[in-house]
Amino acid sequence: MNRVRMARAGFVAVLWSVLLCLAGGCASTAMAPADSPATVDAVTLNLWHDKQDWPRRQDAIVADLRARGPDVILLQEVLQDAALPNQAQVLASRLGYQYRFFSADAPTQARRYGNAILVRGTIEASREVKLAPLDDYRNAGWVRTTVDGRPLNVYVTHLHHTPEGGAIRAEQIAGVLTLIGETAGDAPSIIGGDFNARSDMPDLAPLRARFAEAYSDAHPGVDANAPVHATLNPHLGHAPVRIDHVFAQRDAFRVVDADIILDQPDATGAWPSDHYGVWVRLMHSDVPRR
């Protein structure tokens, strides 16, 4: 008799579990799993288009990115031409990522130059805008993706390059922020690229008001703009300045770590690019600190 009662009790418990699941909604595949790390790894890199030995540089870049496996990759100075397959497409194919290429050049042109976003998951939506002034041929791109069950907006840009062009960069930042306002919705956002300016410059102040610059946040108490932290490659004739950044929405993420990557030559002395890359790890701010 006790065994019968125990069996009935077990059946009732299972039945209640099923009914509660149906009524309250079981965890769906669209929700983040309970053990989800709730982190986002991102890399930004200026590719230096097809300068020097692109096939050799490509191999070095692929090897590094494959080992890291970032969730998103932001590329600048991406080139395609009649004899050159789109560099972002090639990298995405080799890494198994989806990509979007953004260019101010007409789609009918054989030679197109611009930026790209690669994602390890699925690209759910995308958009691009040209940035003023139009004769500067700059743009910003956006994709919506999902990382560990959480929606994410990803933006890429490459701003005006002259040292005296702060006002132009400020105008371009305004264009980027307009794009964010029109596309972000309720999902958190990150933006990265080659800003051609230190992150503490007045040109970028409107962006800093809403977005934390990840590398500086990951290295508190040090001068993150010192030459040792540069992203321009001094071995290829550049002044050592850090102008490549990833910004994370302040009320959505906290910075876990950040590093300069792709900053070593291969055995033949070839460098991956004339810029170093930046890798960052972000954690959603609703995840408790450990």
Where do the language-model regions lie?
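Bacterial N-terminal signal peptides that target proteins for export
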Residues: 2-15
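N-terminal, active-site-proximal structural segment of metallo-dependent hydrolase catalytic domains
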Residues: 8-11, 22-94, 107-111, 281, ...
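Metal-dependent phosphoester-hydrolase catalytic domains
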Residues: 30, 181-190, 197-290
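Active-site beta-strand/loop signature of hydrolases that rely on acidic residues for catalysis
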Residues: 40-47, 61-84, 118, 143, ...
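Short, solvent-exposed loop/turn segments at secondary-structure boundaries
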Residues: 53-56, 130, 164-169, 270
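Structured beta-strand-rich core segments of catalytic domains in phosphoester-bond hydrolases
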Residues: 54, 72, 76-159, 256-261
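Extracytoplasmic/secreted proteins, especially bacterial periplasmic and envelope-associated proteins
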Residues: 56, 60, 64, 86, ...
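Preference for well-ordered, secondary-structure-rich cores of eukaryotic proteins
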Residues: 87-93, 111, 171-175, 182, ...
